[in-house]
Amino acid sequence: GDYIMPYLGASPDSVRNGKINYLINGDMMIDQRLEGAAYDAGDNNDDVYTLDQWIILSESNDGVDVSRDTTVPSSGAINSIKLDLEIANEMFGICQIIENKNCRDIIGQEVTLSFQAKVSNARIGDIRAYILAWDGTADSVTSDVVATWNDDANPTFATNWTAENTGADLGVGTSFAKFSVTGTIDTSSTANVAVFI
C-alpha cells in the first residue's frame, strides 16, 4: 500500500542550538514489543501502542500497518516509522503523550514540533501536525486524542484536548523534507502535552 514515513529524532542543529527534545524515541530506534516486526493483524488497531511511546490512531482497526524502517533522511538517522495504508482513504496518525513530570517546563511556552517525512505516492495528501494540550487530570489522559475525523480538514479532538496550533496541509512529497509547526501551550490548567501527526 501507500505509506508515510516520519522521522522525529533530534537534528544536529537543535543540539547545537541548545534545544531540548521532549519526545521519547523520536528516532524510532526502540521497539520492545515486536523488535522491528510489522504491527498488523490486531497489533495495529486504533489507539494501540506500537514503537515505544508511539500510539497509532486510525478510523478503523487494522487500517494501517506500522513498522520500524531503515529508509531515513540523510541526516545520520538509522530508523524511521513506516505507516503503510491498508484501507483506501483511511484517516490515521501517530501520537505521543508527554508525562506531566516531563512537560511542566514547556507549559505556557512557545514550542515547535519538527520532523522529517515523505510519502510513497503523492496521492496521499493532507498531512497535518498538532501540538496538543490536555486540561484534565494529569497523566489520566484520553489516549485516542481524535473524537471525529474530518475529511481534508482538522479533526475534532477528544474532550480535554486542545490544539495549540492551527493545522494545515503540510504538502508532504515523495522525498524527505523537514516540517515544523509552532504553538504556545496556553490552555488553562494544562497538565499534559502531546504531539499528533
Residue ranges and their predicted role:
Residues P6-I197:
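Extracellular and organelle-lumenal recognition/adhesion modules and their flexible linkers in secreted
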